[in-house]
Amino acid sequence: MKLLEDRILNDGDVLGENILKLTFLTHQVDFELMREIGKVFAEKFKDTGITKVVAIEASGIAPALYATEALDVPMIFAKKAKNITMNEGILTAEVYSFTKQVTSTVSIASKFLTPEDKVLIVDDFLANGQAAKGLIQIIEEAGAHVEAVGIVIEKSFQDGRALLEEASYPVVSLARLERFENGQVVFKEADI
């Protein structure tokens, strides 16, 4: 997605060998860009029968919400912290965050997923694939089907895509980062 790649080049900060800071996605969200991202995902998956979009809080919510709006289906986001209102029928998975270097237990209320659901997972970044893997575990535990994993930005130099594709989950990434070179992003051809 050229619009996204241009924004990454203009506003992205490469931190070290494998971290890209993008505040338009993770802090002060650019809703117009997120709306375009949502439309692209919706166009790609409009004929697949998607019934739900699933994301993990927090940065995955914005692109997932706009994909949900464009697909006209409900969105569910996995919570990273348990609260007292989620006290029964909870599906959980352990998820390691590459950026934060911590493991979180993410959860979704089981009543929101059924065996009839065809799910599109939407996430902001794909690095080692652990967030998507955790969501897949929860979705399949509910008996629902993962139709595809939609990624805003993929770090192609890490093994997340291979992990998901080896398990037969289609991955669609709007921007694919091949490497960082001299503090700059080098792109690989995106899926869309």
Curated annotation (Swiss-Prot):
Top EC category? transferase
GO-annotated cellular components: cytoplasm
Chief location of this protein within or outside the cell: cytoplasm
The entry assigns this protein to a family as follows: Belongs to the purine/pyrimidine phosphoribosyltransferase family. Xpt subfamily.
The record, for HAMAP family, names: XPRTase (MF_01184)
Assembly information from the UniProt record: Homodimer.
Q: What is this protein called?
A: Xanthine phosphoribosyltransferase
